Design a protein with these regions (language model features):
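Catalytic metal-binding acidic patch
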Residues: 31-72, 159
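Short conserved micro-motifs at the rims of enzyme active sites and ligand-binding pockets
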Residues: 60, 171-172
């Protein structure tokens, strides 16, 4: 059976072949293990790695890193510059926002405080940076997923999971409660997920419900302070990398880096 922590270390090892450790903020799992729908021996472990750009790359106006590593077992690691990560946070992409809450990650000790201060400390605010954008983003993702393969059990399961998410998000529930279904709902999702072929009526009904939800709007709010804070997080992370390279002895970490939880 696939061990999630072992997979994280394997993904990190591949990222380290491309970037030095001081440029890697962390490697974070995303997907079924964060929703409670991970099935041992069946589900893949996919990750996102956050890279800090150097001052030289900024001066040369290098394009922010955005690439993927594909593994033979079907898993993949998405590598992104922290500027791109923050951009996806602001776009309210659920696949990126969930890394703020995952229990499965390798967090570079050199960036642990920075990650906590600029991102994790305000994660509930970040996930509601633009609630209307988040709402429409999830609806669009759900409809696209269901239309791709309307009889596939995994897609139907994802559809119901996203419907549950929207219902909880609308009620203002904590984000972790939004992305992790109750035990009762989880049992239903897993049942659907294990089915290879289902009636297309499930997808049809779900799409109709999502289409109806498109009209809903949250009250607008001022997010300028949070926007500035996130931008400061980008700036400070780049300055921090520069400080690490100027005085590496101050940031030396003895021993193997542990898998950490972002809480």
């Amino acid at each position: 059976m696939r061990n999630i922590n072992e997979a994280l270390h394997e993904h990190l090892a591949e990222v380290l072949k491309i970037y030095p450790e001081d440029q890697i903020l962390g490697v974070f799992a995303y997907g079924s293990m964060n929703y409670g729908t991970y099935i041992k021996g069946i589900s893949d472990v996919d990750t996102k790695a956050i890279i800090i750009p150097t001052f030289r790359e900024l001066c040369l106006n290098d394009k922010p890193v955005s690439r993927e590593i594909h593994f033979e077992n079907g898993e993949h690691c998405e590598i992104k510059d922290i500027r791109e990560i923050v951009k996806m946070f602001k776009k309210q992409s659920i696949n990126f926002l969930e890394i703020l809450f995952t229990e499965y990650c390798w967090l570079n000790p050199m960036y642990k405080v920075l990650w906590k201060i600029y991102f994790c400390q305000f994660k509930e605010d970040i996930v509601r940076f633009d609630e209307n954008k988040a709402w429409q983003s999830v609806i669009g993702q759900a409809i696209h997923t269901l239309k791709q393969n309307p009889t596939n059990g995994k897609q139907i399961s994802n559809g119901y999971r996203l419907l549950y998410f929207l219902e909880q998000y609308k009620e203002g529930k904590p984000y972790l409660e939004c992305i992790k279904p109750t035990e009762e709902n989880l049992a239903t999702l897993l049942q659907f997920k294990k089915c290879s072929c289902l009636s297309a009526n499930y997808a049809k009904d779900l799409i109709e419900r999502f289409e109806e939800m498109k009209e809903f709007r949250f009250p607008k709010k001022d997010n300028s302070k949070l926007n500035n804070w996130l931008n400061n997080g980008i700036e400070y992370s780049i300055r921090h990398l520069d400080n690490i390279r100027k005085e590496p002895w101050r940031w030396k970490y003895d021993g193997e880096s542990d898998l950490s939880e972002t809480k």
